[in-house]
Amino acid sequence: MPIEVVITNDFEHLSKVAAEIVKKKLVELLKRKKEVVLGLATGNSPTGMYKHLARAANNGEFDSSRIRSFNLDEYIGLPGENAQQRALHPESYCYFMIQEFFGLLKKKFIETNVPFGSLIDQKVLIKELKRYPHDWACKGTGAGKSIVIKQKTGSEYLSWIRKEILNGYMQKIKKAGG
């Protein structure tokens, strides 16, 4: 599939054009499938597009109740005594997506999924990363930097994160057809 370059005037125009592209694809897929898996980026760039998509769904241009979404990101280390408090913290991507997209829909998605970052206790994670420096590697540069936990670890906590949180989320996406 060739790449198409689209030049827009400003953020609002970009948001409308992007929403039209996504809406067109959703309508096409919903004609053929019972439900659609939609991957969602998090951050300020897609917020205008999300508002246009919510408006289109609310106007009946596509059936949002047949969509299952998966977000790409979630923070770890947000304040809160438990996972629920961290997930609903105003700086969490879960909260952000409710404010910017999910909460705007009259007909809710079948299911919305944000990675389980709120389950990770940052203090324990930092302690385990220091204690087991050979169990993980740092990949990428700048804002794109991430930690990769190796397959075999001496740390039960790092092993749990890899198996239950990271791999568990990927398996859920695959099971949904994404």
Question: Would you name each region that the model predicts?
Answer:
Residues 40-45:
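Glycine-rich beta-strand-to-loop/alpha-helix junction loops that act as flexible
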Residues 53-54:
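Distinct, well-ordered alpha-helical segments
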Residues 1-2, 13, 62-176:
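Ligand-binding beta-strand-loop-alpha-helix segment within the catalytic cores
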Residues 12, 46-47:
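Alpha-helix N-cap/helix-start and coil->helix boundary motif
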Residues 1-38, 58-59, 131, 136, ...:
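N-terminal glycine-/serine-/threonine-rich phosphate-binding loop
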Residues 7-8, 39, 82-87:
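A short glycine/serine-rich beta->alpha loop
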